[in-house]
């Protein structure tokens, strides 16, 4: 043996293995087929516009609004002709923030005080919701085909359809909540892209908390949109809370995936403060800004309560205008909190939240069965009912169960995000089940149900390691289901739009005893 052999540390041993670098997520920050994606989105949006605007001005109640349109259409008209505030002469109090009525007023300004006028803005928002759901599904599934499927499903959803064609506030709440969700999905991808580049630059472990992520404009946009949601209905606050927690969890997981030494503490140190600003201060500022006409008015409801219902002195140096707004807000809250069954408040179409996932107790917005012509039978019926398309809503429980399993067991963030959105519109209502409630509160749940179904269909289409026969079977299954939903929607179309049908057909449309 030579000296060289004995002096070599690796003599007589195999070559050492090189330790691999830490495993990080692949650089996947969104779909890449942008041209195809936008072409598909344009087609789906055009289809949505046709369905939402076709014969939009009908039906009416002898030329007047139907159901709760009787509140919001007149209030929007007052907004239009009273410097942006409601006179509200026919009711004791205006009990919802102003943004929804301000948007309804745009349509009334364009087309006048008629069915088209007071429903126009809602229909525009309904089309935007379809576009947003399409884009969200495409982004989180990384599939333009799945995005198209989601778009078709939301077009054919009875709840989303009817809410887009009536002058209630819920469609505006849905649009702002879904738009905020869309912003947060883009923000999630952007955060991971920034973390990826920080990893390549060696900046991940510069501190125990990981890198700062810079200005996050998509998340800022989500804060603005959530403020508009709260300024439409106070239930928008639930989405502020649920989405705020969701994005912080996303941040912590991203830091963990890119091997930040202390990811959760890093999230608390780096991300919690900016998130509090985006989900706290920004929505509050937007909410206050929506009351600008009220602040500027001399005659708005409760505008000058300091010195009347409120004492002139205050412990904190709060401007009188804000104190008056707080008094007004508290009066509206008192109205809602006292609207309970125990106090004798009942409505023939009220429902409780456990009936909402399967659309077990819909809402009849309008019905006319007296001397109605046009159906070819002796007895005709015209009705508008807010009801979910059964092919989707009747399977809500297994869909949600599957989504929960995918979230908890398979750690599939896509299903988790969709569940957060769904539960934000569902769970908080269980806090006071004695309150008078209606199925139209569940309108905001519909887009997230559609997203969950679209993800499941996408998993059927793109299940890995499938042989050609199983892939073909999966494609046929998805096509059959989408066709079933569209057929179901077409069958129910008359009771969603107020078209005249025979009494026999009406009885066939009402599937469940609880629908009567």
From Swiss-Prot:
InterPro entries assigned to the protein according to its UniProt record, in alphabetical order: GlyclTrfase_39-like, Glyco_trans_39/83, PMT_4TMC
Organism: Mycolicibacterium smegmatis (strain MKD8)
Start-end of Polar residues biased regions: 1-11
Region (Disordered): 1-23
Taxonomic placement: Bacteria, Bacillati, Actinomycetota, Actinomycetes, Mycobacteriales
Annotated GO CC locations: plasma membrane
Pathway noted in the entry: Protein modification; protein glycosylation
EC assignment: 2.4.1.-
Domain of life, per lineage: Bacteria
Misc. remarks from the entry: DNA conjugation in M.smegmatis is unidirectional with distinct donor and recipient strains; mc(2)155 is a donor strain while MKD8 is a recipient strain. Mutations in a donor strain that alter DNA transfer do not always alter DNA transfer in a recipient strain.
Effect of disrupting the coding gene: Loss of DNA conjugation when disrupted in recipient strain, strain does not secrete EsxB.
Name of this chain's protein: Polyprenol-phosphate-mannose--protein mannosyltransferase
Function: Protein O-mannosyltransferase that catalyzes the transfer of a single mannose residue from a polyprenol phospho-mannosyl lipidic donor to the hydroxyl group of selected serine and threonine residues in acceptor proteins. Involved in DNA conjugation, in at least the recipient strain.
Main location: membrane
TM region(s), chain numbering: 113-133, 143-163, 166-186, 234-254, 275-295, 384-404, 413-433, 437-457, 473-493
An annotated Gene Ontology molecular function: dolichyl-phosphate-mannose-protein mannosyltransferase activity
Membrane topology recorded in Swiss-Prot or TrEMBL: Multi-pass membrane protein
Compartments, as annotated in UniProt: Cell membrane
Homology family: Belongs to the glycosyltransferase 39 family.
Keywords for this protein: Cell membrane, Glycosyltransferase, Membrane, Transferase, Transmembrane, Transmembrane helix
């Amino acid at each position: 043996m030579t000296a060289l052999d004995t002096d070599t540390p690796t003599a007589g041993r195999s070559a050492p293995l090189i330790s691999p670098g830490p495993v990080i997520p692949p650089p996947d920050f969104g779909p890449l087929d942008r041209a195809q994606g936008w072409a598909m989105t344009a087609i789906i949006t055009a289809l949505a516009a046709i369905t939402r605007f076709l014969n939009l001005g009908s039906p009416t109640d002898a030329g007047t609004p139907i159901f709760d349109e009787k509140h919001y259409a007149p209030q929007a008209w007052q907004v239009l002709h009273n410097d942006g505030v409601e006179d509200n002469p026919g009711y004791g109090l205006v009990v919802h923030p102003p943004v929804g009525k301000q948007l309804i007023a745009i349509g009334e300004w364009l087309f006048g005080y008629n069915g088209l006028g007071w429903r126009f803005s809602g229909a525009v928002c309904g089309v935007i919701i379809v576009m947003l759901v399409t884009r969200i599904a495409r982004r989180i599934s990384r599939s333009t085909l799945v995005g198209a499927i989601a778009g078709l499903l939301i077009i054919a959803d009875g709840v989303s359809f009817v809410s887009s064609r009536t002058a209630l506030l819920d469609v505006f709440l849905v649009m702002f909540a879904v738009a905020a969700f869309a912003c947060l999905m883009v923000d999630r991808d952007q955060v991971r892209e920034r973390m990826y580049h920080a990893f390549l630059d060696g900046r991940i472990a510069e501190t125990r908390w990981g890198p700062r992520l810079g200005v996050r404009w998509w998340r800022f946009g989500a804060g603005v949109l959530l403020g508009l949601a709260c300024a439409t209905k106070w239930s928008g606050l639930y989405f502020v809370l649920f989405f705020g927690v969701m994005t912080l969890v996303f941040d912590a997981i991203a830091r963990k995936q890119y091997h930040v030494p202390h990811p959760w503490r890093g999230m608390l140190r780096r991300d919690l403060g900016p998130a509090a600003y985006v989900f706290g201060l920004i929505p509050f500022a937007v909410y206050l800004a929506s009351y600008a006409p009220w602040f500027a008015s001399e005659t708005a409801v409760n505008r000058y309560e300091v010195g009347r219902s409120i004492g002139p002195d205050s412990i904190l140096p709060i401007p009188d205008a804000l104190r008056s707004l707080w008094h007004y807000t508290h009066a509206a809250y008192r109205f809602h909190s006292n609207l309970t069954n125990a106090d004798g408040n009942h409505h023939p179409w009220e429902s409780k939240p456990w009936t909402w996932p399967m659309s077990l107790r819909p809402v009849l917005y309008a019905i006319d069965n007296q001397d109605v012509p046009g159906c070819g039978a002796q007895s005709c019926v015209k009705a508008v009912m807010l009801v979910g398309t059964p092919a989707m809503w009747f399977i809500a429980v297994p869909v949600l169960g599957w989504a929960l399993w995918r979230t908890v067991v398979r750690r599939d963030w896509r299903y988790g995000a969709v569940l957060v959105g769904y539960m934000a519109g569902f769970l908080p209502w269980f806090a006071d089940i004695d309150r008078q409630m209606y199925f139209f509160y569940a309108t905001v749940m519909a887009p997230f149900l559609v997203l969950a179904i679209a993800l499941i269909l996408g998993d059927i289409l793109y299940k890995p390691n499938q042989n050609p026969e199983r892939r073909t079977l999966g494609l046929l299954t998805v096509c059959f289901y989408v066709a079933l939903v569209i057929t179901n929607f077409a069958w129910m179309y008359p009771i969603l739009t107020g078209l005249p049908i025979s009494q026999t057909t009406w009885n066939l449309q009402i599937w469940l005893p609880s629908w009567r």
